[in-house]
């Protein structure tokens, strides 16, 4: 197995340690390996979608990037049916998009938010 070094913020490291203890992992590396596998599986499943789909996209982001969210959103108004926006504690915002459209276009929207690197949490649920 290859050893890699990763820089993590203190809060994230505390959360990883809590997960390790709560779920009984033997170490931090196990937690990170499982998380990486889950992300890879989620990405693979997203790329297997085809045809017209319905989806809900959840985002949590800092308020300071609202303009970026709006800019990306405007490029996908053809598939976004509804958007809900709510201010959360700690200067964050929650966005909820209800989407209907071609799977490739839905995937592209989710990937744009992922690629910008400014989102704290992204979750796409398809059906």
From Swiss-Prot:
One of its GO terms (molecular function) is DNA-binding transcription factor activity. Ni(2+) binds at residues 74, 85, 87, 93. It comes from the Archaea. Binds 1 nickel ion per subunit. InterPro entries: Acetolactate_synth/TF_NikR_C, ACT-like_dom_sf, Arc_rbn_hlx_hlx, CopG, CopG/NikR_regulator, Ni_resp_reg_NikR, Ribbon_hlx_hlx, TF_NikR_Ni-bd_C. GO terms for biological process: response to nickel cation. SUPFAM superfamilies: ACT-like, Ribbon-helix-helix. Its cofactor is Ni(2+). Keywords: DNA-binding, Metal-binding, Nickel, Transcription, Transcription regulation. Disulfide bonds: none annotated. Pfam families: NikR_C (PF08753), RHH_1 (PF01402). Belongs to the transcriptional regulatory CopG/NikR family. Transcriptional regulator. This is Putative nickel-responsive regulator 1. It comes from Methanothermobacter thermautotrophicus (strain ATCC 29096 / DSM 1053 / JCM 10044 / NBRC 100330 / Delta H) (Methanobacterium thermoautotrophicum).
